[in-house]
Amino acid sequence: IEISKVDFEVLSLRAPSLHPNNTGRQWYGLYPPNWDEADYEVNQLLLSLRKLDTYNISLKKTILLGFSQGGAMAIDVGCQLDIGLIVSCSGYPHLNWKPDEKCPPILISHGLMDEVVPISASKNIYQNIKSISKNFCVLNKFEGYHQIDPNFIEYVKLKIEELF
């Protein structure tokens, strides 16, 4: 990603285990969802991110971005921290996720024809956050499936330049 006005570093956290069909990685078991494992991984990620200040990395200048299960993790973890921005692509709310009025700004994107994670999941996140948070929350719906919308990435780049 090329962003002209912002000086930044990328930290990419890798999910701890392989997806069962070897197409990627996962934070917790999916089939069926292992919510206890999800809660554990959320807590582990929170512990890790809270240590960023020891490396002179400000949470207020941190962006959490995730796709699918990673989008779910970004939403759950990000809403518990005072971070700069959450970006969720084709994500969904975790079973125990409860947003509050302190949720940071959130950008959500979801394909209208997604058969893996229904768009209703992102609509649910959007509606919950809009009902209680003063920060902005955007839901980008696009003609597509379980994928990342290239046009949305351009929008994210503009938002990053605006916010940071």
Predicted features, each with a name:
Residues 1-57:
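Serine-hydrolase catalytic machinery in alpha/beta-hydrolase-like enzymes
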Residues 56-66:
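Alpha/beta-hydrolase fold nucleophile elbow
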Residues 64-66, 89, 109:
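Short beta-strand immediately N-terminal to the catalytic nucleophile in serine-hydrolase-like folds
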Residues 66-70, 74:
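Gly/Ala-rich beta-loop-alpha elbow adjacent to hydrolase catalytic centers
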Residues 76-80:
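Active-site signature of alpha/beta-hydrolase-fold catalytic machinery across serine-
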Residues 82-93:
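A conserved short beta-strand
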Residues 107-110, 114:
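Short beta-strand/loop motif that positions the catalytic acidic residue
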Residues 120-126, 132-164:
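C-terminal catalytic histidine-bearing segment of alpha/beta-hydrolase fold enzymes
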